[in-house]
Amino acid sequence: KHPAKYIYRKPPALDDGWPTATLDEENIDRPAMERFIQRLIDVPQDSVNAPQHHAFLLVRHGKLVMEEYFHGYSRERLHDTRSASKSMTSVFVGAVMNDDWRLTLNSLVYQVMNGGSFPADLDPQKRTMTLEHLLTMSAGYYCDDTDDKAPGNEETMSDQTQEPDYYRYILNVPMATPPGEKSVYCSAVANLALGMAGAALHDFPLYAFDRLVAKPLRLGVYAWGLDPAGNPFGGGSVQYLPRDFIKFGQLLLDKGRWNGHQILSPEFATRSISPLYHLRKVTYGYLWWIEDLPYKKRTVRAFMALGAGGQLVMGIPELDLVIGLYAANYGTRTQGHLREVIPQFVLPAVREPGDDQNAPVIDQEYTNPYGASPDGSRVKP
């Protein structure tokens, strides 16, 4: 059987806060995008290594212009976001800061988590650890998720049974470097940022998330995982509906504002997606990845929420563009497949004012740079 020929249709306007438009109305080449979606449809599913795509959404100038689903997925079906959830944790922390003066980037982790005072005999390095260190993964814990020997490694933490409270678990992990010196990818640190926001409010984090983020963003149903002690896990695997998942990218693109609601301060939103540390051959802000992508004869800066398997929200402020992806490229499947096809096939279809509307769309060569961290150092101004 040959897959059916794809025909583009404008996304439906629903009661979820998204205005919709056509590709043509927002200056995106429709034939090029039709070829791109057909390319996704035509991927053979004859191997465990075959890329499998579940959803592709595209927003231009704040309007949803493309919404496509594959392999039985739909807009009504929740999807695991894996580590892309870390970026949503950052949004929650920023929303708490915007709502309550008691939490700042300089708030001291152990003071907040201990009810206002430091624990007795606390490691001097831990005494200086701040919320900003958690958001940039530069806390200094021995917790590298790629190091099986690290006691704060996510798998080590989730496999152990002695401490059901994951906030308390990471607080007791030894230090590897002073806070702020080096960024190391560590899910437990992102989770602790969520716990710190809840502790500052003296509230269960999910109640605060619902009030400060979910309601103003008009999120539908969503699902958070809990640790064995019943705390929400801020390091990954929150499930969102596709049209809700992509809202987080638009929120950051619009400097923390969504449909009249200032959920984040403009300063926090801007710094969240600024390159602060080198991490995995790209750069990192406040639990958001930052990378420069080829576009025409220059590069454009993109910020990204990334999750294993191909989960992605990408915003490109210079093009007023947001992209959302769900996929199942786990294990031996091509993890970075969709990240590569965006600069190859999607960005060339995006027009700017003054472009020749009849010019052919030329695919762009691109190789994903994502890989092992060379140093984890600060980005120099």
Locations of the language-model features?
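Active-site SXXK
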Residues: G62, D80-N106, L134, A193-A197, ...
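N-terminal leader/targeting segments and the immediately adjacent pre-domain N-terminus
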Residues: K1-S74, N98-L103, T136, A349-P381
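Active-site-proximal alpha-helical segments within enzyme catalytic domains
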Residues: S90, V189-M196, G236-W258, Q311-A328
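Active-site-adjacent helix/loop patches that line small-molecule binding or acyl-intermediate pockets
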Residues: L108-N114, D121-L219, P242-G256
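Active-site Gly/Thr loop motif
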Residues: L219-Y222, T270-G324
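Structured C-terminal helix/loop/strand segments within mature extracytoplasmic catalytic/sensor domains
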Residues: A305-P381
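Acidic/His metal-coordination segments adjacent to aromatic residues that form catalytic metal sites
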Residues: F70-S74, Y167-P178, A223-F233
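Carbohydrate-binding/catalytic loop surfaces
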Residues: D227-L241, W289-E291
